[in-house]
Amino acid sequence: MAEKQQAVAEFYDNSTGAWEVFFGDHLHDGFYDPGTTATIPASRAAVVRMIDEALRFANVSTDPAKKPRNMLDVGCGIGGTCLYVAKKYDIQCTGITISPEQVKCAQGFAAAQGLENKATFDCGDALNMPYKDGTFDVVFTIQCIEHIQDKEKFIREMVRVAAPGAAIVIVSYGHRNLSPGEESLKPEEKKTLKKICDNIVLSWLCSSADYVRWLTPLPVQDIKTADWTQNIQPFYPLLFKEAFTWRGFTSLLMKGGWSAIKVVLAVKVMAKAADDGLLKFMAVTCKKSK
């Protein structure tokens, strides 16, 4: 495993336990109505809503006659998305992550929910997945590609394992699209993004226009994007409120160590960058050509 991948695996191995109070068995942001006040109970509902909104955006049908046969979650965390989709759609779900600790957690959650035969989890490399071409009816990833250096290869690998007609769904942080005439972000913007990436072991962030550019030459159709930045912003004040108390700080430190504290420090920067229009939270979807 490459040094960068090992760092990502260790980051999640060390910090995963710190976030269960907010997210349960999920490790991604929640989807809120803009301007609402988030609470811990609401945050657990919001992470599930994020999955529903992403699948709805990709036109994944809940009709029993039209529903997908199976789904792959690339960067599956501790299995929350797979378990939710397996139960809701009554389909086979597979998750892949580079963190052995996350695989163990996901398998434990599956066993606790009686879903061992519906949801399976593999430890592996998202750039070289151990699945045959055209295997999955939905290929889903949320807040994983930010960790990947070769994002274009990551997307090609997602398309490879997607079946003809499959929905491909990417939900991720990124940055604003460049304005006409701009060749790159401003130096101070690059500095801000580097600070975020360094604290939470991200490789680099791209724009929704980059995703469209990488997808366009591939055998896909119906590419579309959405900006969901306003839908995640209500969580930031909740995290600050809970983390910047003695009880919250010590809990994060005990359960997640310095890795968890660095996430909180990064989120302070992320909140301002989102307010400034630099940081974006986006959804991208397309269909594998038949």
UniProtKB/Swiss-Prot annotation:
InterPro entries: Erg6_SMT_methyltransf, Methyltransf_11, MTs_g-TMT, SAM-dependent_MTases_sf. Homodimer. This is Picrinine-N-methytransferase TMT4. Pathway: Alkaloid biosynthesis; vindoline biosynthesis. Its EC number is 2.1.1.-. Residues 161-170 are annotated as: SAM motif III. It is an enzyme of class 2 (transferase). The gene is TMT4. It catalyses: picrinine + S-adenosyl-L-methionine = ervincine + S-adenosyl-L-homocysteine + H(+). S-adenosyl-L-methionine-dependent N-methyltransferase involved in the biosynthesis of biologically active monoterpenoid indole alkaloids (MIAs) natural products including vindoline. Catalyzes the conversion of picrinine to N-methylpicrinine (ervincine).
